[in-house]
Amino acid sequence: MQISTRHLILLVSSLLWALSTNGQFYQGSYQEFGKNRVQYKDFLWQQFRFQEFDTYFYEGGQELAEFTSRVASKNIHSLEEVFDYPVRDKIQFIVYNSHSDFKMSNVGINGDDEGNIGGTTQIVGSKVFIYFEGDYIKFEQNLRKGIARVLINKRLYGGNWRDVIKSSTLLNLPDWYIEGLILYASQAVDDDAQNIIRNDVMTGAYEKLNRLEGRNAAFAGYALWSYIARTYGENIIPNILYMSGVSRNVESGFLFVLGKSLDTITKEFIAYYRGEYGSMSMDKTAISLDKLDIKTKGDRVLTTFKISPDGRHAIYVDNILGQYRLYLYDVLSGKRKKILKAEHKLLRIPDFSFPVIAWHPSSGAFTYAKEWRGKLMLCTYNLDDGKTTEREVFTLDEILSMKYSPSGQQLVLSAVDNGQTDIYLYYNIGNRQERLTDDVFGDFDPSFSKDGNRIVFTSNRPDDTLRTKPEPIVLGQNRDVFAYDLKSRSPYLERITDTPDLIEKDPYQYEGRQYTFLADYKGTTNRYVAVYDSAISRIDTTIHYRFFTVAEPLTNYNSDLLDYTVHPNTGEFSLLTYADNDYQFYHGNTSNDGAATRVATEEGEGGLSEEPITNRPIRRESLEEAELTFLPDKEEEHSDQEININNYKFEGEPDYTYERETITLMEVPSDNEEYRPSEQGYTVLDTLPLPGARNYNVNFTTDKILAQLDNTFMGEFYQPLSGPDGLNPGLGGLVKLGVSDLFEDYKIVGGFGLAGSFDNNTFMVMAEDLTRRTDRRIQLFRQQSRFSPNGFNLAENVTYQAAYRLSYPLNEVFSIRGSGMYRFDELILLATDQFNAPTPNEISNYAGVKGELVFDNTLPMGLNLRRGMRWKVWGEYYMDPTN
């Protein structure tokens, strides 16, 4: 039985109301709350050491670490050129196998220092935390983002702790400045982000940059820096960065270098992009499908929208600050039902990969994949009785996408295991999976054909041959459409598209050899239909055929399609798009696609034989020439039987009519030749020899310094009853120094506080071990205070306390804590005259235990401003062990 947070709060409040307790003098102005990280497994770290950097990884992540090591050097040097600033310190790349593992880490766990007026200075380091999301393209983008962040911080705040303290005190940069510059340098912006930028520019959302938050601020900054690079040259960016650091002012950086104020630059870049986007949208058409009246809130991110095979129901998922909700929507009644709510709203990197959803072909159920307590779960929801069945999926790290077979007995998965994204066939009976591909290339978005005998998917593989763990010579930065024959299990795939500079996604197979997918060919992501066909290549002793694809655009919309689902057996499909500051939901039937193709052919709109868009407004690198229609020739031999070459017909061939010329882009080498594509459009891995893996040894570095004026005690502490003089220690200085290990699993904090009169002083040292789920802390504390017990005499109280605490997190916002402590108090009556000099000191000893329930889901909105709720319930027991 699960107790909701609301019910637990009501229970605790009732108990507090019913209890009759005697108040005691307690220092309550400082109460420790804080979020938690929940470790469901142990991390045993190893490392590769190089001259410029070190790469750290754990079990199951060696392939990721090797990839990181091979591409890190070229990315470091590339970003050094962008910022015109060298990396002087060795960078530590810390690789996590998945986003879920990264959320278990202790990276970024801090106390409540944000409430201190003096603030905390975070020491700039050279650590780069990266995690694998199933796609090596995104993985390398995250790597570049981390390197860019290190370079920007070093450039602005300096390389040693003295420069850091000075710069962080005087320089406060907005999110759009830092995060936008990181996105620009790393080029970690996909088509969905481009669509949001286009929408925000056209609706005027970027006119007040400093009011933007989160990803909107980052996208706005990316657009501004891209405009500056295109208008004034990329080499001007390091100068702006340098002047901002020297002058300690954002405005001055632009004014000194460009001679224009930030307001002027903002108006110019908005006008520039409005012109670009306006010209792009002139030949676009509006979506004419049935639109569902689904209301969404502006602060939520929609990640999934899928119509049922019968078109009666739909599922969509929204996400806000990492918390996602899954809704079932009735198309006829317009009502919705919340099926699932998971995770908590926290200021962290959101994970948009879950839940992964697939409709059962009967339309009476759907299956979704989620993560629960470190486990990968498949859950099936039945629409008839509203019940959900769950089962754990073993051996896989993450599921990226999945679709049901026409029979409903199997699922095809794109899943991650040990740094590889491959295609799996999952059997509902037996809860087992069969691996269909096994190589370093990424395989995504699989779906079954109408008869269930073929699997269509996208991949960045350079050729059409399946190999078991081939040497990673190159990794494609594009995705092409491939088909796999389930009956023959042939290692030779059918290549449907060959576009070195484009990414196709969400492919499905129609009737026969017709396919549909999404692609960004004319500046926006639209639907396409492709026909796979063959023709005679040449005749010698045998007849040789070449296979090619003719593709047509089905849509020419002004906004990108974010999610696309097709049910080949019923023809129902759904689209999710973002336009006019709102997510929009559409559905239709593929029976109308033929008409759409004829219209596109007759009017010449979006035909793929036209010149592709090569100047998408804010891409740093323009697209090279690419033809979605083209496919490498592939020859196939047939028998020597006599054939009339002037009048022939393939068996079982549909009667297609083609109105466009088919051109051969490139020849595929013969089977005994090695396939070596050009470096254009591919990531060529460095061939540097990798050293042997070493075990990680714990070492500490300074990570924060706190210095402030303060009038509170340093911790939760019972004060000796000494009259009004002991209410607070008086205004004085407080200094804390914190060190932590590389992974922030071990922390040591030392500090002292001195009152202005030097009558009161406090010293403390604390050590924490956060490596396991149960966090451990030991704290030593000394406090000395002086007061007048009767207005004439002076007394001094010296307290020593040692405490040991265990904290067990139930989730990221709720924890159970238990402490044991021993305290020694000595009351000294100072010898101010001959009468009180002989007075002996009073000695007190206390031993105690404390239990706490702590809840904290607050979000910082600014200094001493929080949104959310935090509460604590605790009980204590003390005794004198000497009596």
Regions found by a protein language model. Give the residues of each.
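Transmembrane beta-strand segments of outer-membrane beta-barrel domains in Gram-negative
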Residues: 779-883
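Juxtacatalytic substrate-recognition/specificity segment
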Residues: 23-167, 174, 191-192, 253
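Active-site-proximal alpha-helical
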Residues: 79, 173-195, 199-260
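Blade-terminus and WD-like Trp-Asp/Gly-His loop motifs, strongest in beta-propeller folds
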Residues: 305-313, 356-365, 402-410, 446-454, ...
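A flexible loop/linker signature enriched in serine peptidases of the S9 family
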Residues: 195, 298-299, 317-327, 344-352, ...
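Outer-membrane beta-barrel channels and translocator barrels
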Residues: 362, 405, 449, 453, ...
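Outer-membrane beta-barrel initiation region
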Residues: 640-773, 843-867
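Beta/coil-rich, acidic/histidine-enriched accessory regions frequently appended to metallopeptidases
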Residues: 26-32, 36, 45-47, 246-348, ...
